[in-house]
Amino acid sequence: MTQQIKTCKRKVMDDEFYTMYKDVVRELHKYDLRNKRIICPCDNKNSNIYKYLKDCYYDVKCDDREWKNIDYSKYDIVITNPPFSQVREFIRYLISIKIDFIIIVSDVLRYGIKNNKTNFGIGIYKGKDAQKFYRPDGTITAVHCGWISNIKDDWEENEKL
């Protein structure tokens, strides 16, 4: 195998982090997703984000196409764990098409709240609380990351009910 192919394969693996079910529950259960058409453009039907949303009987779809080639007008919200190497471009795109989103980003504090277009999600995980992810090789690794969203913080109101 040439060095270039080895480097490319390593880069792809280094961009693959699969969210654990408990971390999905910890974040998403606080949002009111009833009657929302949800797309998970960077996940497949084996992802824990998709499984959680299906377990809660939400209207959720995965799409095998590249995230740039999806017709988002059919959906109300994007919930996904995008490839960390593409997250900046992905966020810019979602903001430009004015669709609600809840996504996981690595090194969340770097993104912060930009021009009042995104908010921190409920969970930001650093240090000993870093969120754990499955890797393609079956190992588990901790990543400093968090959820961001452009949805109004209605979960605070839901907590009071």
Model-flagged regions — what are they?
Residues M1-I77, P83-L161:
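Class I S-adenosyl-L-methionine-dependent methyltransferase catalytic core
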